[in-house]
Every structure is written in structure tokens, then in C-alpha cells.
Amino acid sequence: MDLKFATFSSEIELPFYSALFSSKLDHDKLDSSARPVLGLYEPRSHASPEASTRMQILGSALTSDQDESGPLGMTRAEGYIKNVNTIEEFKNTDKNAMIKKAGEQIWDAIQDGTIYSCPSLLASFRILSYADLKKYKFTYWFAFPALHSEPQWKRTGPIGRLTSDESTALVERIGTWRYMVDRREHGFFLAKKVRREAAGPRSSLDDPGVDIGYRWDIGSLRDFETGFFNDAAEEDRYVAFVDPSNYPEYPSWPLRNLLILIRQRYRLNKVQILCYRDTQPRRHEARSTILPLAMDQVGDVELKCMPKVTGWERNGNGDLRPRVANLAEYMDPTRLADQAVDLNLKLMKWRLAPNLDLDAIKNTKCLLLGAGTLGSYVSRNLLGWGVRKITFIDYGSVSYSNPVRQPLFKFEDCHNGGKPKAIQAAEALKEIYPGVDVEGYALSVPMLDHAIHNEAKTKADFDKLKELIDSHDAIFLLMDTRESRWLPTLMGKAANKIVMNAALGFDTYVVMRHGAAPNDGSEETLGCYFCNDVVVAADSMKDQTLDQQCTVTRPGVAAIASALLVELLTSILQHPLKQHAPAPVSTGTGSAVSYERDPPDHPLGLVPHQVRGFLSNFQNMVIRGKSYPQCSACSKPILDAYKEGGWEFVKTALASRDYVAELSGLAEVQRLAEKAAAEMQWSEDEEGMDEEEGEGELI
């Protein structure tokens, strides 16, 4: 009777897809080289015959090394997966060449004897796949390469079975043998019966239980060539393999390659195959079968060339076509969002910026002072870069003029006086991406030249602001007024934080990073927003007309400035010195000004100090400015007084901007300027003037 075989069918655990997607995105990138993958199979007595021969790919299949074989009782199979970059590459891959190459690996191992070190190659497989990382679809095709026997092996007698006692003794012997050999040998082995008269008296080391009249001896496949069967009768010799098939008459797929080994290495054309289907917990069930096989006589048992190879898996409809797994149907939406947010960022590392440190950006905790137009755009850009921690501070409410310019708010947010901006901005960001850790605080930032009406509340606001600045890495100054930025500038410099600032005009903007305290003990650093001021910031809202009270700018200015500000932050985070990175120095003059990367391998380019933009002529200027020794916000006297006095200093400063001017030295600068102006004599060229009028000087 011709021998038929039960083919393997693939069974992939969901975690494997995630592991493969992650590996492709983070490690393999454009590399589509085949990489090892571990397959597992096992006898499953409870499964129907059609569902019994499963090649299982567990979640850890990509990372399991050669010493691992999965859960107890499972047999390993050696596999490779080739995950290509496009669906067209998947379609155009030469499938015949691929399975032929897999068959050659088995054939060569049989020919040179290395199969004895890794018998699990006899159950090897290949996977051709394409992972669509955007749509979470996985197109794949398994191949289980099988070498054809020609002439075919045939069953020469009835299928044999073991008794329950024989099966129990066999399972115990196999279990003992497996402890002594490599796990790759567990699926294929030799077995023989050693009769009692040959074995001598029964010892305490023999199988426990009922005396079956013989004992089982188990050996590795290589032992055949060293005389393992020499002392056993022909009817007591078995070549065995772990058989997951539950078909009564059909053994599983790995037997096909084992029969080639038997012919090539053992030079046999007649053999008893032990289809080992028993397991330790159910060893008494005696499910294993014995197949007496033989093939027609041939002139030379040994094959001269590799036989035909087949084995591509059929899909669920029985067609020789690949399968498609739509993972979006099974994955948690929040987890899908997490992976989707990181997708475009990780793709940057494939070709364009392989040295980009995405974790440095992702783990940066950002505090946004202002949840209006700038705050809305900045927060969305931070989300785009994968930032996971964002906190808003704003004391205002959403008004009807806001939603069209501030993308975090809707019309409904304006009703009944408007929702608190900071709270609503946080909720909106959470709706956009549930994985973000976002909070909002309706907090009034104490401002210079604004009277303190409730000292307890103002101090509480100051304490909360200090707590938030201390617990974040990057501070964004995005408020409407100049004086509202003074205290956060001072506190950010004192805490040695990254301080980012954006300010808007009608068609102009400035985007800058504040200089951090130097690491080398020197006083020179980059300037802050206030370093160009010659007077201390005052109440800019006093006696203002409506067009001066509102932020009147061209609508696109805020989006441009916000994008540049976030891009500047990411460039800072890629620099080895972070906020202490020096500003680039220009080379060349005029229209030929250029800048060199520092360091040269910076993945994003320059880390400028300031970018000033002019929408009227669509130009940007990169500017570098030193800190001003008499700055009202970041000079040494101001910093020292704040560090020493804390709230008491702030209270005094808020109440009297003259105090800040005197302490910083700005007042003295003004006095010296006035004195110089008073002493300066203005003269005009006397040529051509009417001397009779006597007007030669003007004081």
C-alpha cells in the first residue's frame, strides 16, 4: 500500500506578529535577509486529525536560541523567515528556488552527516512574508520542504501498536534519554527492544511496573552507524520520530525527509517506523503506531543527486496561495495607536537618520506655559515626535474667537463662559492620542508690574509653578505677554532646564532656546528672551486698545513658529551636550552665509540659538546672542537673589520693577546712558550756513 502523509499546517500566535513588526521597524529596517525562527509541534490526542499536525510559531519564536525548545513536551523545528519590504517583492520572489534551497540544506546535511547534530532540520520550514506596518496586515506563505522518495516507500503489513504497559515503558525510556541529548535530537531517534534473555536479570534501574519481557533502549540517529542495532533482532529495531498526526494510517510530514536519511545514510530499503504519538501525561493510552515499510529494489540504494522538493502550504480554501492576517481586527485600539504613533518616527531610522535617538525625545517631559494658539500647535507637534508627557498651564477660558485658530478647541468649548483652556487642552490631546500622559492646570503665572491682590493665592501659584518646572525637562514659554515670561525664564534658568520660547508679531516671529547655566563654571552663555532689553518688562496690558490687547498676527505665523520651536527642541535633544550645546558659528558673508554641523554627525543638523522669521519676504535669520550681564531675568545678581530668597525675592520683584532694574544693573546702565547723552555735544557741519544767524550748535 502506497504511503501517504499528513501535511503540516501553520499556526501563528498573535504575539509573534507584534514581535515581527517590532523587529522590522527597530532592527531589520530595509534588511530583508532570512533570519532564524523556531517552530514547535507536538502530539495532541484531543485534536481532530485535520487539526493535529500544527506547526506552531510562538510569540518568542524570533528570539529563541538553539538551546531552547519551548514548553515541555513540544518538539522543535528549524525555520527561517524572509520578511520582504514590499508586496511586489513578495509576489516576485522565486518560490521554486526558495523551497529548492531549503531542500538543499536538508539534503546537504544528510550527505555530510551534520544532520546527526541537528535532526530537527528534518522538520524544517520556511516563511516568506510581507508585513504592512501601516495597515497591520501580514501576508505570509509557509513552506515545509519535503524530499521525495523514488521509488516510493510502501507499507508491507498491518499497522502495529503497543500495549499500555509497553507504551508506558517506552515513554519513560524516551524521557530519560532526552535529558542526556541536545533538544534538537528529541524529534528523531532509534529504539530497540532488548529481550530479557539478552538483557540478563531485571535490575532496579529497569522500567518500573509490569514486566513486559524486554526493555526499551533509545539512541540518537548517529548511533546506527556505530552498531546500535547489532544485538537486536530485525523485528525489534525501530527508527522513530515524533508524529503529531492523529490520522490512523497517515504519518506526518517529517517522515518524508527521515526516509531519505534512512536510504542515504543507513542504506536500507526496509525498515520499521515507530510513529511516536504518546506523551508523558497520557502514556498509558498507547497511541503510537508501528509502520512496516519497504521500497522496491533498486540497483543502488544510495541516491546520486538531490530528489524533487515540494511543500508549499495550501491556504484555508485548499489553494496554493499565501495567507493574509488582518491584525487590526485583533489588536487593542490603544495599542494600535501606540504603534502607529511611533511608525513614521522609526521609519526615519531606516535610511534618513539611522543615529536618531527617539527615546531621548519620547522620554522628555514637556511643560507648556500657555494653551492658546502657540500651545495648541506646539503640543500637536510634540505628539508627532512621540513625546509622551505634556503638561499645560493656562489661566484663561476658551472664547468664541479661539477654535478657528487654536486646533485643540471646538465650538462647544466656548459655551457658558468657556471651559478652562489648560484643562480642555489636556482632554483634547487625550482624545487625539489616548497613550499620552497629559495634565492641565488652571494656574495664574505671577507677572512683573502686576499688583498682587491675594498674596496667599499668588504664592500658591508660584509654589505649584516651581513644582512643575522642577518635575519637567523642557519648559515652553508660549504666553501672550512679555512680562508673563519673566518669572518662568528666571525659574527655568535657576533649575538648569531646557527653556524654549516663541513670540509672534503681525508677520514676524522669534523662536529661541534660552542659554543654560554653564557646566564649566564660567558666566558666559547664550542669551534669553530678555537679554536685549534695556528696561525691565512692564504691564503691557495697561491702557491698550482692542487691537493691542489681542494677539493680531497672520494666521499662519503661529503654526510656523510652533513647528520650528519643536524642531529646535528635538535638535537640542540629539546633541550630546543637550541644553548646553553651543550655537553654530557662521562661515561666509552676505548671501553666502553657511553653518557647519556641530557635531558633524548630528542626525538633524544645526542647533541654532535663535531663528527670526519674516513672513513679508518669507525669510529666516539664524542669530546667535550672548547673555547680557545686566539681564533682568537671567543675570547672575537676579539668579543669586532668587536662589537665596525664593518667594520673598519674587514678591518684592513683582511689586517693584525698579527693584529688578537696580538689582540687575539695568538702572545703572540707564543712568550712565542719560549722563553720556547729557554730556554729548551735538555739532553740525558749518559749511553753507548763515554765520550771521549764529546757529552753530544745538544742545
From Swiss-Prot:
Gene3D superfamilies given in the database record: NAD(P)-binding Rossmann-like Domain, Ubiquitin-like modifier-activating enzyme ATG7 C-terminal domain, Ubiquitin-like modifier-activating enzyme ATG7 N-terminal domain
UniProt xrefs under InterPro entries: Atg7, Atg7_N, Atg7_N_1, Atg7_N_2, ThiF/MoeB/HesA, ThiF_NAD_FAD-bd, Ubiquitin-activating_enz
Family in the record: Belongs to the ATG7 family.
Keywords attached to this entry: Autophagy, Cytoplasm, Protein transport, Transport, Ubl conjugation pathway
Any single Pfam family the record assigns to this protein: ATG7_N
Protein name (Swiss-Prot/TrEMBL): Ubiquitin-like modifier-activating enzyme atg7
Positions with biased composition (Acidic residues): 682-699
Gene from which the chain derives: apg-5
